[in-house]
Amino acid sequence: MKNLCFYFVDVFAEEKYAGNQLAVVMNAAKLSNGKMQAIANEMHFSETAFIVSDKKRNGGYDVRIFTPSNEVPFAGHPTLGTAYVIRHFIARGSASKVVLNLKVGQIPVTFEKAGDQEILWMKQRPPSFGKIFEMRELAETLQLEEKDFDCRYPIQEVSTGLPFIIVPLKTLNAVKRAKVNTSAFLSTAKQVQGGILIFSPQTYHKDNDLNVRVFVDLFGIPEDPATGSGNGCLAGYLSRYRFFGTEKVDIRVEQGYEVRRPSLILVKAETEGEILHVEVGGKVFLVAKGELT
């Protein structure tokens, strides 16, 4: 295998060594599926992204995303992190928008100046709403009591490309106490082939609107520090059920505190006609560069 360049970036971070870690491997066209999976397992981040070519196809760059255990059709923080690498190291800073060709389809990423930094925004597919779950099933899965759940809102599967079960809880204390019962979790998560996102309107920091934790054991990720795909699903859920009193959503979500990777995810949702548009944004920091030999 010819030496391949890779970058480490921190996504949804406010500074280096926070947020969600990502490895981005360049010029990966000649890597087999098995080799990509082996590299992702070696990196052992939540996901590793592979830029198949530095040439555009149909206006976008072909990208594949792997967790330590399998390939996924879409994931949020790899989308933003890979777009950052493409903009700075392939387009050399000249692109105002980068389009990724993922298994789920084309995902555009735009760049917004924020002082001497930039916020990356991705527009996700319109959310689809699936199965509604019984409270007692998630209480067993998360080892919580039924009184911890906010019964004003449903526990529901939502997907913008990767499904998540959205679970509303009343308090930050309940979010912190949640502990996955692995066998129950796998039984529940397999019903949607995705993860579980729990949230509360109580937060660690007063400037933030929600606190979130995400569990994705099904893909070899016990707890994810920052989840763009899951928070996109959450945005759709908040809009549909008017959690903030309106279907328009424009909020700050904190995640990752329980795994010592504090993260900030910016979340927007708005209905235009019959289409619910969802955007997720955050900052990206370059941490390291290296070579695979």
Describe the role of every protein-language-model region:
Residues 1-74, 80-293:
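Active-site proximal loop and beta-alpha junction motif in alpha/beta enzyme cores
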